[in-house]
Amino acid sequence: IIQATYVLNAQDSRNFWREVSSIPVSGERLTVPSSYRALNLDLNLLQQYLNTAKPEPSQTSNLTNGLMLEVPMPDGSFERFSIFQYNIMHPDLAAKFPQIKTYTGKGINDVTSTIKLDVTQFGFHAMIRSSKGDVYIDPYNQNTVNYYMSYERKNLVRQNSFECSLADETAMEIQNTVSNTVQRTNGTLLRTYRLALACTGEYAAFYGGTVSGAMAGMATTMNRVNGVYESELSIRMIMVANNNLIVYTNSSTDPFTNNNGSTMLSQNQTTCDNVIGSSNYDIGHVFSTGGGGVAYLGCVCSSSNKAKGVTGNSAPSGDGFD
């Protein structure tokens, strides 16, 4: 009986998707893979199905007894995953944004696969990592939540340049304060960090100019970041309970210089300390639409530098930003 239910659920989840020969949606595309599988999604049915997923177990290595979900792959096949709900936000913050749902899972067909997926007001997003390479599923563009692309990361055509740099004036100071016997993760213990994630008014404007829109964009990005950090460093970041207080929607009154990453380092440190409270977060960061990527080295949990990190891109969405 259990096996029959297992197969039925997996088969039903395939029916949320319908392959299409073309996508009848106009508008600018920020994600432009050279090759992709075009799909139509019944988002409402998928949401209803995902809402039945169980919470992630305390032992994150045991992800084999979750909701069975079949996911469309770029080559025309479907792969099965065992899915659980998990929180990328503190429960108090998640209660303020019930439309944002994040999920994690493990591959069934391919046991090397892991998946992170989310559903927000901007649709469905998924990132699959395996020994065969990375696969993404994203809306065709910002004008639709019903048409999607399933594509391999290696086929992604970069639309925007991105520069990442290091603010190194404190690197030597930090290096001198870190013990040579720091314990490194062995991959079996998942370490959680409290994240204070701010944004500029310009970033929020990209997501409709609302706190809920900006939070949705942040959730998609951080879900994918966690997908990488969990598998490679056994680290997870969760947004703090009052994170909404540092999501700014007015570029004229926010505390940030949107196009200057170096300047925003100290601005974000001050903002996170004053609004969130230094003792209430482990790492801080700010999203913008300019300023590139810049951060201090080894600053996590360092009280004077732990919020000095910036990520900015004119189109803060998709793999180029996430």
Annotate the PLM regions.
Residues I1-Q3:
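Sec-dependent N-terminal signal peptides
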Residues T5-Q142, T263:
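N-terminal prosegments of processed precursors
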Residues D12-T31, T144-S304:
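Fold-level signature of zinc-dependent metallopeptidase catalytic domains
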Residues L46-A53, I83, L117, M149-S150, ...:
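Generic hydrophobic, helix-prone segments enriched in Leu/Val/Ile
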Residues F124-R129, D282-F287, K308-N313:
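Short, hydrophobic/proline-enriched secondary-structure or compact coil segments at domain edges
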Residues A214, V310-D322:
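Short pre-active-site segment immediately N-terminal to the catalytic Zn-binding motif
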